[in-house]
Structures are given as C-alpha cells and as structure tokens.
C-alpha cells in the first residue's frame, strides 16, 4: 500500500479512486491532483513507481486534508455556536440548519421519536 497524507491507499484500485480514501479528496480533487502530478489516472496503485508516489505526495500537500480539515470544520461550527447566530443554535440543538421543516420529517437530525403516553378516555 502506498501511504499518502498519512493514509494507506488501497493497492488494487485505480489511482483516481484510491485517492478518494483520503478525507477531503473527492473525485474532482483527485483528478486535479493527478493532473498536477502528471500521473495517469487509469493505472493501479500497485503499478505506481516511487517517483510517481512522491509526485502525488507533493501535490496532495498543497491542500488542507485529513485532521487539519476536520479541525477547521469543527472550529467553524464552534465559532457559529459561540457567536450565537441561528445556524449555531440549530447545530447546538441538533436540528436542521438550512430552513427545512421540523414538524414532520427531520427524523435523522432530531433522533428517534420520544414516546408520549396516550391520554385515557
């Protein structure tokens, strides 16, 4: 396995797909990394030589990925919560943030239903 950005990427997959195992790298970014490094996207990871792997490492270093990206996203959410804006409050209450309805639906975000005892007649 080639190790890029602290992640062991799978040997049997095409390089283009294998790069998406890195947090913060999707298919589009993987294609741009391969173009920047000058590596053919159709070859398998096991067929890469050391020079190609080194080129990929240097190309990947120019992006914010993995732990740094997770930390950056967490700090952005914490900032929203600290300033007390609506988005931050919705995140804190585990409710949908982008204006979706919550009277019905939003079950994934709100969690499982809380059982309410039925009234006796």
Swiss-Prot record:
What domain of life is recorded for the organism? Bacteria
In its keyword annotation, does this UniProt entry include Hydrolase? no
Q: Where is the composition biased (Basic residues)?
A: 100-121
What stretches pass through the bilayer? none
* GO terms for MF: rRNA binding; structural constituent of ribosome; tRNA binding
Cite a single GO BP annotation: translation
Pfam families tied to this protein: Ribosomal_S13
> Which stretches does the entry tag as region Disordered?
91-121
The cellular component terms of Gene Ontology attached to this UniProt record, alphabetical and capped at eight, are: cytosol; small ribosomal subunit
UniProt entry keywords in alphabetical sequence: Ribonucleoprotein, Ribosomal protein, RNA-binding, rRNA-binding, tRNA-binding
Please give the family membership noted in the entry.
Belongs to the universal ribosomal protein uS13 family.
Quaternary structure annotation from Swiss-Prot or TrEMBL: Part of the 30S ribosomal subunit. Forms a loose heterodimer with protein S19. Forms two bridges to the 50S subunit in the 70S ribosome.
Which PANTHER family does the record associate with it?
Answer: 30S RIBOSOMAL PROTEIN S13/40S RIBOSOMAL PROTEIN S18 (PTHR10871), SMALL RIBOSOMAL SUBUNIT PROTEIN US13M (PTHR10871:SF1)
Q: What does this protein do?
A: Located at the top of the head of the 30S subunit, it contacts several helices of the 16S rRNA. In the 70S ribosome it contacts the 23S rRNA (bridge B1a) and protein L5 of the 50S subunit (bridge B1b), connecting the 2 subunits; these bridges are implicated in subunit movement. Contacts the tRNAs in the A and P-sites.
The protein here is known as Small ribosomal subunit protein uS13
Organism name? Prochlorococcus marinus (strain MIT 9211)
Annotated gene: rpsM
């Amino acid at each position: 396995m080639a190790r890029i950005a602290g992640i062991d990427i799978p040997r049997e997959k095409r390089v283009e797909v294998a790069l998406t195992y890195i947090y913060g790298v999707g298919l589009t970014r993987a294609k741009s990394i391969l173009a920047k490094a000058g590596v053919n996207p159709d070859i398998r990871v096991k067929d890469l030589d050391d020079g190609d792997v080194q080129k990929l490492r240097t190309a990947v270093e120019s992006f914010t990925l993995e732990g740094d990206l997770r930390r950056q996203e967490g700090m952005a959410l914490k900032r929203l919560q600290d300033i007390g804006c609506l988005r931050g409050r919705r995140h804190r209450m585990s409710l949908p943030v982008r204006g979706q309805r919550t009277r019905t639906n939003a079950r994934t975000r709100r969690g499982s239903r809380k059982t309410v005892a039925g009234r006796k007649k």
